[in-house]
Amino acid sequence: GDCPWKPWC
């Protein structure tokens, strides 16, 4: 998923 590097996740 994107959450580890996308601050708006």
UniProtKB/Swiss-Prot annotation:
Disulfide bonds join 3-9. The lineage of its organism: Eukaryota, Metazoa, Spiralia, Lophotrochozoa, Mollusca. It is found in: Secreted. PROSITE patterns: CONTRYPHAN. This is Contryphan-Vn. Signal peptide: none annotated. It comes from Conus ventricosus. Expressed by the venom duct. The keyword Nuclease does not apply. GO terms for cellular component: extracellular region. The modification Cysteine amide is found at residue 9. It comes from the Eukaryota. The cysteine framework is C-C.
